[in-house]
Regions:
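Short amphipathic alpha-helical segments with heptad-repeat character
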Residues: 7, 11, 44, 48, ...
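Alpha-helical bundle segments that constitute or directly flank the non-heme di-iron/ferroxidase center
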Residues: 1-28, 49, 53-60, 135
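A short secondary-structure junction motif
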Residues: 17-20, 24-27, 110, 114-117, ...
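Short leucine-rich amphipathic alpha-helices used at interfaces
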Residues: 6-7, 20-21, 96, 140, ...
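Short, contiguous alpha-helical
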Residues: 30-79, 116-152
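Solvent-exposed interaction patches of small proteins and small membrane subunits
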Residues: 1-9, 63-69, 90-98, 124-128
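Acidic/histidine-rich alpha-helical segments that form the ligand environment
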Residues: 9, 76-118
Length: 152
């Protein structure tokens, strides 16, 4: 895939993710149990903090810096997610929704600014994009769709 195709793939997966919760009332968005104890609001926050991580680590990767492992920094991905869940718990649904949209816009703007040659297949740069965007969103979209089907 070239740069434009990668961005289109990110945006398609993003739209599908948002479609999964489209039409939910605010009280449904904060109801726990969608994915473990997490609500849709929590899943939105989760996706957004991983996009924040993407914005931190993609520039490092392009500079040849290997980001430290989450196991070293936090004791693992689950520990990082728990820490971020606690950090984001103080935000209202509206604040989370605003942050989600702002962060995603920054991701797209950043990707558009990166030269085409950095999007080569198999690179650490491309793998990080996959892990934090179009490989990540569908997993949580499915959780939301499954929950909606189960609770309807």
């Amino acid at each position: 895939m070239n740069k434009q195709q990668v961005i289109e793939k990110v945006e398609k997966a993003w739209a599908d993710f948002h479609q999964a919760y489209n039409g939910l009332a605010p009280e449904q968005m904060i109801e726990p149990g969608v994915d473990g104890v997490w609500s849709v609001r929590d899943l939105l926050a989760h996706v957004s903090w991983w996009e924040d991580e993407l914005l931190i680590h993609l520039p490092e990767i392009l500079q040849g810096i290997r980001p430290k492992r989450y196991s070293v920094l936090y004791g693992g991905i689950d520990a990082f997610n728990a820490l971020m869940t606690e950090k984001w718990a103080v935000l209202t649904l509206a604040e989370v929704q605003r942050k989600v949209m702002e962060t995603h816009a920054k991701v797209i703007t950043y990707l558009q600014s990166v030269p085409e040659e950095e999007f080569k297949s198999g690179s650490r740069f491309r793998r990080r994009i996959l892990l934090d965007t179009y490989g990540h969103y569908p997993f949580h979209a499915k959780s939301i769709r499954d929950w909606r089907e189960k609770t309807s």
